[in-house]
Amino acid sequence: WNLREYKKQMKNQEYLKETYEWKDLLAIVHKLRQPDGCPWDSTQTYESMKKCVADEAAEVVEAVDNEDFINLREELGDLMLQVLMYAEIAQERQEFTLDDVIDELAKKLVRRHPNVFGDEEMSRTPGEGLSVWKRVKKEEKTLRKSLPNIAENHIEIPQKIQENG
Protein backbone atom coordinates (compact mmCIF):
# COMPACT_ATOMS: atom_id res chain seq x y z
CA TRP A 1 0.00 0.00 0.00
CA ASN A 2 1.61 3.21 -1.17
CA LEU A 3 0.14 5.94 1.02
CA ARG A 4 1.60 8.78 -1.03
CA GLU A 5 -0.02 7.59 -4.27
CA TYR A 6 -3.29 6.74 -2.54
CA LYS A 7 -3.48 10.21 -0.96
CA LYS A 8 -3.48 11.82 -4.40
CA GLN A 9 -6.78 10.07 -5.16
CA MET A 10 -8.49 10.74 -1.85
CA LYS A 11 -10.63 13.75 -1.01
CA ASN A 12 -10.96 12.91 2.70
CA GLN A 13 -7.30 12.60 3.69
CA GLU A 14 -7.79 12.98 7.44
CA TYR A 15 -8.40 9.22 7.59
CA LEU A 16 -5.19 8.30 5.76
CA LYS A 17 -2.27 7.38 8.00
CA GLU A 18 0.92 5.41 7.77
CA THR A 19 -0.06 3.48 10.91
CA TYR A 20 -3.45 3.29 12.59
CA GLU A 21 -4.35 2.97 16.26
CA TRP A 22 -7.46 1.65 18.01
CA LYS A 23 -9.08 5.12 18.18
CA ASP A 24 -8.54 5.54 14.41
CA LEU A 25 -10.32 2.27 13.70
CA LEU A 26 -13.27 3.30 15.87
CA ALA A 27 -13.47 6.65 14.05
CA ILE A 28 -13.43 4.89 10.66
CA VAL A 29 -16.24 2.49 11.64
CA HIS A 30 -18.24 5.42 13.01
CA LYS A 31 -17.72 7.37 9.75
CA LEU A 32 -18.85 4.39 7.66
CA ARG A 33 -22.17 4.32 9.55
CA GLN A 34 -22.91 8.04 9.03
CA PRO A 35 -25.34 9.36 6.37
CA ASP A 36 -22.34 10.60 4.37
CA GLY A 37 -20.51 7.31 4.94
CA CYS A 38 -20.88 4.05 3.06
CA PRO A 39 -24.44 3.28 1.87
CA TRP A 40 -23.95 -0.43 2.59
CA ASP A 41 -22.34 -0.06 6.04
CA SER A 42 -24.77 2.63 7.15
CA THR A 43 -27.81 0.46 6.47
CA GLN A 44 -26.61 -2.69 8.23
CA THR A 45 -28.63 -4.03 11.15
CA TYR A 46 -28.13 -6.76 13.74
CA GLU A 47 -30.19 -9.05 11.54
CA SER A 48 -28.49 -8.23 8.23
CA MET A 49 -25.02 -8.82 9.70
CA LYS A 50 -25.66 -12.31 11.08
CA LYS A 51 -24.41 -14.05 7.95
CA CYS A 52 -21.36 -11.76 7.75
CA VAL A 53 -20.27 -12.54 11.30
CA ALA A 54 -20.76 -16.28 10.75
CA ASP A 55 -18.79 -16.16 7.48
CA GLU A 56 -15.93 -14.22 9.05
CA ALA A 57 -15.74 -16.61 12.01
CA ALA A 58 -15.61 -19.55 9.57
CA GLU A 59 -12.78 -17.85 7.66
CA VAL A 60 -10.80 -17.49 10.91
CA VAL A 61 -11.24 -21.22 11.55
CA GLU A 62 -10.21 -22.02 7.97
CA ALA A 63 -7.05 -19.91 8.26
CA VAL A 64 -6.11 -21.71 11.50
CA ASP A 65 -6.85 -25.12 9.96
CA ASN A 66 -4.62 -24.23 6.99
CA GLU A 67 -1.95 -22.75 9.27
CA ASP A 68 -2.17 -19.64 7.09
CA PHE A 69 -1.13 -17.12 9.70
CA ILE A 70 -0.71 -14.24 7.25
CA ASN A 71 -4.36 -14.68 6.25
CA LEU A 72 -5.33 -15.26 9.89
CA ARG A 73 -4.31 -11.69 10.72
CA GLU A 74 -6.61 -10.36 8.00
CA GLU A 75 -9.49 -12.64 8.98
CA LEU A 76 -9.21 -11.65 12.64
CA GLY A 77 -9.47 -8.04 11.50
CA ASP A 78 -12.59 -8.87 9.49
CA LEU A 79 -14.12 -10.59 12.52
CA MET A 80 -13.20 -7.63 14.71
CA LEU A 81 -14.96 -5.35 12.22
CA GLN A 82 -18.15 -7.33 12.77
CA VAL A 83 -17.87 -6.81 16.53
CA LEU A 84 -17.21 -3.09 16.05
CA MET A 85 -20.16 -2.75 13.66
CA TYR A 86 -22.50 -4.49 16.11
CA ALA A 87 -21.26 -2.23 18.91
CA GLU A 88 -21.65 0.88 16.72
CA ILE A 89 -25.24 -0.11 15.88
CA ALA A 90 -25.95 -0.73 19.57
CA GLN A 91 -24.55 2.67 20.48
CA GLU A 92 -26.70 4.35 17.81
CA ARG A 93 -29.73 2.61 19.30
CA GLN A 94 -28.59 3.64 22.79
CA GLU A 95 -28.54 0.00 23.93
CA PHE A 96 -24.87 -0.28 24.93
CA THR A 97 -21.41 0.88 23.88
CA LEU A 98 -18.17 -0.81 22.93
CA ASP A 99 -16.84 0.23 26.34
CA ASP A 100 -19.74 -1.72 27.89
CA VAL A 101 -18.73 -4.80 25.88
CA ILE A 102 -15.10 -4.44 26.96
CA ASP A 103 -16.10 -3.92 30.60
CA GLU A 104 -18.40 -6.95 30.60
CA LEU A 105 -15.77 -9.16 28.95
CA ALA A 106 -13.03 -8.11 31.38
CA LYS A 107 -15.33 -8.74 34.36
CA LYS A 108 -16.29 -12.15 32.97
CA LEU A 109 -12.65 -13.14 32.47
CA VAL A 110 -11.76 -12.16 36.04
CA ARG A 111 -14.89 -13.84 37.49
CA ARG A 112 -14.38 -17.06 35.57
CA HIS A 113 -10.74 -17.34 36.58
CA PRO A 114 -10.92 -17.32 40.39
CA ASN A 115 -7.94 -19.66 40.24
CA VAL A 116 -5.91 -16.83 38.67
CA PHE A 117 -7.44 -13.61 40.03
CA GLY A 118 -9.11 -14.87 43.19
CA ASP A 119 -8.19 -16.99 46.15
CA GLU A 120 -8.92 -20.40 44.62
CA GLU A 121 -6.03 -22.79 44.25
CA MET A 122 -4.27 -22.44 40.89
CA SER A 123 -5.31 -25.01 38.30
CA ARG A 124 -2.50 -27.41 37.46
CA THR A 125 -3.79 -28.62 34.11
CA PRO A 126 -5.77 -27.16 31.21
CA GLY A 127 -8.60 -29.55 32.11
CA GLU A 128 -8.78 -28.19 35.66
CA GLY A 129 -8.81 -24.64 34.29
CA LEU A 130 -11.68 -25.50 31.95
CA SER A 131 -13.58 -27.14 34.81
CA VAL A 132 -13.31 -23.94 36.86
CA TRP A 133 -14.56 -21.90 33.86
CA LYS A 134 -17.53 -24.22 33.32
CA ARG A 135 -18.42 -24.31 37.03
CA VAL A 136 -18.42 -20.53 37.36
CA LYS A 137 -20.37 -20.16 34.10
CA LYS A 138 -23.02 -22.58 35.38
CA GLU A 139 -23.24 -20.67 38.68
CA GLU A 140 -23.69 -17.39 36.76
CA LYS A 141 -26.44 -18.84 34.58
CA THR A 142 -28.29 -20.20 37.63
CA LEU A 143 -28.05 -16.81 39.31
CA ARG A 144 -29.17 -15.01 36.13
CA LYS A 145 -32.26 -17.25 35.86
CA SER A 146 -33.27 -16.36 39.41
CA LEU A 147 -32.77 -12.61 38.96
CA PRO A 148 -35.88 -11.95 36.82
CA ASN A 149 -38.04 -13.56 39.53
CA ILE A 150 -36.43 -11.37 42.17
CA ALA A 151 -37.03 -8.28 40.04
CA GLU A 152 -40.65 -9.26 39.40
CA ASN A 153 -41.25 -9.82 43.11
CA HIS A 154 -39.78 -6.42 43.93
CA ILE A 155 -42.21 -4.82 41.48
CA GLU A 156 -45.16 -6.75 42.89
CA ILE A 157 -44.41 -5.87 46.52
CA PRO A 158 -44.88 -2.08 46.11
CA GLN A 159 -48.01 -2.72 44.01
CA LYS A 160 -49.48 -4.95 46.74
CA ILE A 161 -48.65 -2.36 49.39
CA GLN A 162 -50.43 0.30 47.34
CA GLU A 163 -53.44 -1.93 46.70
CA ASN A 164 -53.79 -2.98 50.34
CA GLY A 165 -52.78 0.45 51.61
Regions flagged by a language model, labelled:
Residues 3-6, 10-75, 81-165:
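Flexible "arm" and connector segments at domain edges
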